[in-house]
Every structure is written in structure tokens, then in C-alpha cells.
């Protein structure tokens, strides 16, 4: 019996020793993990610092580029106002002339009674069910689609540098567009966004500035995504459409 007790005690001591060894191993592993975690944390902090510095430089470069574009826009405006001929002069003259022609066309429709002022200036935008991106109609949409596309397509076809020509009201609503960008919507929202740009509302900075502009013309520039990671610099010149003394919106002309 005494021998059995001694054997049991030896077994217990051996088990405790084994457990102590395992605890030491776990503790060592934990310490190693802690040390490695500290190293990784330091590396992450260093990487984050580098990324922050890179982001700061990238933001600075973007701002300098935007400042350069803004300076270019102001230069175009100043030269046009001074009557100096530049490569942009024909586009400025074209959009101003066509904006006046569209305004006169709408005034004739009002005089004939085929269009009412309430319909022309309707700003109740009714979503078209099932469209993505969402399209809208107003009481002016039907008349716009009847009257304006032939003018818009003629303008676009007149110069290979012109990418689009479209009117937009004071809230960025485009009731009609070039035929190329007025296709029936399909199931792919990305395709729709590129090819179904009529009956849409646009609130990007360029559209907002063009829509609200009351100066004789507005010149802007921006980078247009052409897909596949390729971008091109687009110039956007617009002129206000004023009907019966009321500012309806603007005619936009985008070109490269």
C-alpha cells in the first residue's frame, strides 16, 4: 500500500512537472508572439506614416493640377472677352449662338401656344419606374425631345472634337440629349450610365456651375473617364438659355 501511494505521488509529481514545462512553453510562445506583434505594430505604424506622407503629396499634386486647370479656364475667358482668337474661340462662339437660337425657338413655341411657360419651367421631376440610373420626366420633356435633338445632333456632327452637346435646366436636368446618348435603357446600369444620359439629373460640380451660370459663357475643364483606366482632358463651354427674360438653364458643349 505504501509503495502504491509512493508510485501515485511520483506520477503526480511527473504530471505536474510536465504541465509546468508546457506552461513555460506556452509562456515562451506568448512572449514571442508579443514581441513579433510589437515588431509588426511598429512596421504598420511606419507604413501608415509613409502612406499618410504619400497621400499628402498626392493631394498636393491634385490641388496644383486643379489650380493649373482653373488658371487655364480663366485665361480662355479673358482672351475670349478681349476678342483674341484662340483654338477655343470657335467653340465659345458656337455655344453662345446656339443657346440664343434655342431660346428663340422656345419663345416662338410659347408665342404659338404649342408650349406653355409653366410647362417649360416645370421643376417637378417625376422618376421613370424601372430606370437605373434613374431618369425623370417633366412637363417639358416631351416638347424638348421633339424640338431639340435635331439641333443637338447637328452641332455635334459639325466638328469631330465635339463629344456632346446638351441643354440642362437650372437644376441640372437634361430633358434631351444627342441621339448617341439617348438610347433605351437596358439591364446593365453601367452601360445605361454611359449611353442613356437624356432625362437625367446631374449634380457634379461642372454641371452645377454650367446650369447656374448667367455670364455670357462659362468655360470649365475636367478629366473624363474613358474606361480601362484611361482619362482624357475635356473642355466644357456653356452659355445660358434665357427665354422671355427668364433664365431656364444652359447649353453645354463638351469637346477635346
Model-derived features: positions:
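Hydrophobic interface positions of alpha-helical coiled-coils
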Residues: 2, 9, 16, 23, ...
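Surface-exposed helix-capping loop/turn segments at secondary-structure junctions
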Residues: 5, 19, 26, 108-109, ...
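Secondary-structure boundary/capping motif
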Residues: 12-13, 41, 252
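N-terminal membrane-sensor/transducer module of prokaryotic signaling receptors
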Residues: 63-256
Amino acid at each position: 500500500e505504501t509503495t502504491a501511494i509512493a508510485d501515485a505521488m511520483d506520477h503526480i509529481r511527473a504530471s505536474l512537472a510536465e504541465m509546468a514545462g508546457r506552461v513555460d512553453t506556452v509562456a515562451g510562445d506568448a512572449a514571442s508572439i508579443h514581441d513579433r506583434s510589437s515588431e509588426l505594430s511598429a512596421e504598420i505604424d511606419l507604413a501608415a506614416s509613409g502612406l499618410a506622407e504619400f497621400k499628402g503629396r498626392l493631394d498636393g499634386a491634385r490641388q496644383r493640377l486643379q489650380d493649373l486647370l482653373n488658371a487655364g479656364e480663366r485665361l480662355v475667358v479673358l482672351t475670349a472677352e478681349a476678342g483674341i482668337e484662340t483654338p477655343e474661340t470657335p467653340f465659345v462662339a458656337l455655344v453662345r449662338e446656339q443657346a440664343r437660337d434655342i431660346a428663340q425657338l422656345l419663345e416662338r413655341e410659347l408665342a404659338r401656344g404649342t408650349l406653355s411657360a409653366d410647362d417649360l419651367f416645370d421643376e417637378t421631376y417625376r422618376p421613370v419606374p424601372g430606370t437605373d440610373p434613374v431618369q425623370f420626366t417633366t412637363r417639358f420633356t416631351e416638347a424638348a425631345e421633339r424640338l431639340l435633338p435635331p439641333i443637338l445632333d447637328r452641332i455635334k456632327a459639325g466638328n469631330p472634337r465635339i463629344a456632346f452637346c446638351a441643354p440642362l435646366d437650372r437644376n441640372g436636368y437634361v430633358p434631351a440629349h444627342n441621339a448617341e446618348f439617348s438610347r433605351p435603357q437596358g439591364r446593365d446600369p453601367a452601360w445605361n450610365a454611359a449611353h442613356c444620359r437624356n432625362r437625367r439629373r446631374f449634380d457634379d460640380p461642372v454641371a452645377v456651375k454650367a446650369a447656374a451660370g448667367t455670364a455670357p459663357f462659362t468655360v470649365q475643364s475636367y478629366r473624363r473617364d474613358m474606361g480601362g483606366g484611361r482619362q482624357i482632358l475635356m473642355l466644357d463651354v456653356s452659355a445660358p438659355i434665357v427665354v422671355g427674360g427668364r433664365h431656364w438653364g444652359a447649353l453645354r458643349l463638351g469637346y477635346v
